[in-house]
């Protein structure tokens, strides 16, 4: 990690109002332009040639604060830097510059992340609990609670490889929402759920926030933003375009999207 970059995790403190502080954050990721090929990789390795890789800027001078006990929704078009932001926040991706201060234990919820296809849904619940350091006596009781919340019925004892995308999402949301993370990062995990289950999850998120937990939610569902979020962050081309009241930020984003659509239609004529 460079001298200009720091990722700091501090113990939760009742006296601090911010769960996450992000200051002038910049990050990039690498994209390989040629198709992966063993012979090409070996030849490049032996000749000390580099693979054809492009560095793509993802975040540029991003600054914001996430209040403790809030639900902050991150919106924007594909490629705006939303998922990259979550990866930086939880420490998966090291930023090039800037500073992140996280006060509390984080859990990243992304469909399929940390799950084992060979295990049943119930076994994956236990695996997640053990990974979070949960005691065995608590885990046994909580497993049944999580299984009931996921609403998978008998499929909870089926191998994960038999699950649909929506079923995986239900299980992942149920596990993450019940392992008592102080900060929960959700990456598009609610996009595939039905209306009833989304309402079910919204109630749980409200309950977590009432306990002082903090949620950062990446989503394309603008209706979810308006109903669930207390703050909204609009990312555009890796920069903060707007931050504040969800209704206001969503309205500005929709106005911009409509103008872009009109410009595109005009250019096509």
Task: List PLM regions with ranges.
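Pre-NBD coupling/linker segments of ABC/ABC-like ATPases
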Residues: 1-57, 247-266
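Conserved N-terminal flank of the Walker A/P-loop in ABC nucleotide-binding domains
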Residues: 55, 62, 70-71
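H-loop (His-switch) and adjacent beta-strand-loop-beta switch element
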Residues: 228-245, 253
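Conserved catalytic/dimer-interface elements of ABC ATPase nucleotide-binding domains
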Residues: 93, 190, 233
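Helical segment within the ABC ATPase nucleotide-binding domain
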Residues: 198-211
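H-loop/switch region of ABC-family ATPase nucleotide-binding domains
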Residues: 219-220
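ABC ATPase nucleotide-binding domain signature region
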Residues: 21, 27-30, 68-73, 77-131
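ABC-family P-loop ATPase nucleotide-binding domains
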Residues: 52-55, 110-171, 177-179, 185-191, ...
């Amino acid at each position: 990690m460079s001298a200009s970059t720091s990722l700091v995790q501090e113990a939760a403190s009742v006296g601090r109002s911010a769960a996450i502080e992000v200051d002038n954050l910049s990050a990039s990721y690498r994209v390989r332009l040629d198709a992966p090929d063993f012979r090409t990789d070996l030849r490049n390795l032996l000749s000390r040639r580099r693979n054809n890789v492009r560095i793509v800027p993802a975040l540029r001078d991003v600054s914001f604060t996430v209040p403790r006990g809030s639900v902050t929704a991150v919106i924007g078009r594909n490629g705006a830097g939303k998922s990259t932001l979550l990866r930086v926040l939880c420490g998966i991706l090291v930023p090039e510059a800037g500073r992140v201060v996280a006060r509390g234990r984080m859990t990243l919820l992304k469909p399929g992340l940390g799950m084992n296809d060979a295990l049943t849904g119930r076994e994956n619940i236990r695996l997640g609990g053990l990974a979070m350091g949960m005691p065995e006596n608590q885990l046994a009781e909580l497993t049944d609670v999580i299984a009931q919340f996921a609403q998978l019925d008998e499929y909870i004892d089926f191998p994960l490889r038999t699950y649909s995308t929506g079923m995986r999402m239900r299980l992942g949301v149920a596990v993450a929402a019940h392992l008592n993370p102080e900060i929960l990062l959700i990456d598009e995990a609610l996009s595939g759920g039905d209306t009833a289950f989304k309402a079910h999850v919204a109630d749980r998120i409200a309950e977590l926030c009432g306990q002082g937990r903090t949620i950062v939610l990446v989503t394309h569902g603008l209706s979810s933003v308006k109903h669930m979020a207390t703050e909204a962050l609009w990312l555009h081309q890796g920069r903060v375009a707007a931050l504040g009241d969800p209704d206001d930020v969503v309205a500005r984003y929709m106005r911009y999207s409509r103008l872009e659509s009109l410009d595109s239609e005009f250019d096509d004529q």
